[in-house]
Each structure stands twice: as structure tokens, then as C-alpha cells.
Swiss-Prot record:
Keywords: Membrane, NAD, NADP, Plastoquinone, Quinone, Thylakoid, Translocase, Transport. It comes from Synechococcus sp. (strain WH7803). The gene is ndhO. It catalyses: a plastoquinone + NADH + (n+1) H(+)(in) = a plastoquinol + NAD(+) + n H(+)(out); a plastoquinone + NADPH + (n+1) H(+)(in) = a plastoquinol + NADP(+) + n H(+)(out). This is NAD(P)H-quinone oxidoreductase subunit O. It is a peripheral membrane protein.
């Protein structure tokens, strides 16, 4: 049995890594159905999807976000955050 050489799949470009101080918003598709969404209000506020929030701390796969509103800071998974543009 002859093996055919398999060509490696083209690597998808990873989004730029978010760093402390970055302006972010929540990716609705990644957030809905997550553990974080289940532990929160069933109707998330629009401002988390509209942004911007400031990424205060990154620890492992989670980031702490501060919104420009009088609300508490929140911890969200980094894959649920995207750069605000």
C-alpha cells in the first residue's frame, strides 16, 4: 500500500493577541451558550457587545475587562473577546 504524501493544511492566521490595556468587546457568537453566559443575566447588556471595554489583566485564558460605565469589572475567556475597532 503506497502512502501519498499529505500536504500540510495552510495555517490560519491567528487573530492578534490581546494585551493589557487593549480596547475590546465581546464576540456574541463565542459568548452565547458559554458557562459565563449561563452564570450571568439571561439578557446580556448591549454595551458588552458594542464596546469598548479596557482589558485590565490577562491571567491564563481569562481577561478582566472594565467597561466605561459604573458597573463591576468582569472576567471573561480570552477567546470571547475581540479587539474593538
Amino acid at each position: 500500500m503506497a502512502e501519498t504524501p499529505s500536504s500540510p493544511a495552510p495555517a490560519a492566521k491567528a487573530p492578534p493577541a490581546l494585551k493589557k490595556g487593549a480596547l475590546v468587546r465581546v464576540n456574541r457568537a463565542a459568548y452565547e451558550g458559554s458557562v459565563e453566559a449561563g452564570a450571568s443575566d439571561p439578557h446580556p447588556p448591549a454595551y458588552i457587545f458594542e464596546g469598548p471595554g479596557e482589558l485590565l489583566v490577562v491571567k491564563g485564558t481569562y481577561g478582566q475587562v472594565r467597561w466605561r460605565r459604573p458597573v463591576p469589572d468582569v472576567w471573561l475567556r480570552m477567546d470571547q473577546l475581540e479587539a474593538f475597532s
